[in-house]
Swiss-Prot record:
InterPro entries: Znf_LIM. The lineage of its organism: Eukaryota, Metazoa, Chordata, Craniata, Vertebrata. It comes from Homo sapiens. GO terms for cellular component: cytoplasm. It holds the Pfam family LIM. This is Cysteine-rich protein 3. The gene is CRIP3.
Length: 217
């Protein structure tokens, strides 16, 4: 199975992929849109579906004016040096400024993002509560509390950028994603199947695979 990298449009195979913003990338193609530094899955900012490093680029382009991530002072930003492979100079006009937010009438549901004096926070897709910068992890293009990023089926806590997804919902790779959406023909070990889904042993490509350090027998 392979995917198409959003950056270079070349195939991405399982062994070389990293997942971020709901897409699969080559590891070295996941770069900041502005300064082209290599980013870690789940450890970067995003705007309009594009990845940015938190500082200085996201803060300089989209952060509250005059306040940095820590809430004190101003962003000090020097334009980045273009990488050797980049021949087109970047200019501020190539980035769309954030649109001003308008207030909601009383009684309306709050938007998925809210403004605070320290910047912008998001609402966690898992629990619906605000996610602040110091506690967030990013996956599938959204910000989560770390304990809320769980497999939809077995509820195991997941690591950002190291899990599967289907229709924007996170799943562990094995066994849940394979069980629900993988090629048909796999089945749980007969000793562990009693009309209920048992996640510890899984039959893949003719082999019994032990998961989470449970013994196979």
């Amino acid at each position: 199975m392979s995917w198409t990298c959003p950056r270079c449009q070349q195939p991405v195979f399982f062994a070389e992929k990293v997942s971020s913003l709901g897409k699969n990338w080559h590891r070295f193609c996941l770069k900041c849109e502005r300064c082209h530094s290599i980013l870690s899955p789940g450890g970067h900012a995003e705007h309009n579906g594009r990845p940015y490093c938190h500082k200085p680029c996201y803060g300089a382009l989209f952060g509250p004016r005059g306040v940095n991530i820590g809430g004190v002072g101003s962003y000090l930003y020097n334009p980045p040096t273009p990488s050797p492979g980049c021949t087109t100079p970047l200019s501020p006009s190539s980035f769309s400024p954030p649109r001003p937010r308008t207030g909601l009438p009383q009684g309306k549901k709050s938007p998925p993002h809210m403004k605070t004096f320290t910047g912008e926070t998001s609402l966690c897709p898992g629990c619906g509560e605000p996610v602040y910068f110091a506690e967030k992890v990013m996956s599938l293009g959204r910000n989560w509390h770390r304990p809320c990023l769980r497999c939809q089926r077995c509820h195991k806590t997941l690591t950002a950028g190291s899990h599967a997804e289907h229709d924007g919902v996170p799943y562990c790779h094995v066994p849940c994603y394979g069980y629900l959406f993988g090629p048909k023909g796999g089945q749980p070990h007969p000793r562990h199947w009693d009309g209920m889904y048992m996640p510890e042993v899984w039959h893949v490509h003719g082999l019994w695979v032990c998961v989470d350090n449970f013994p196979c027998g």
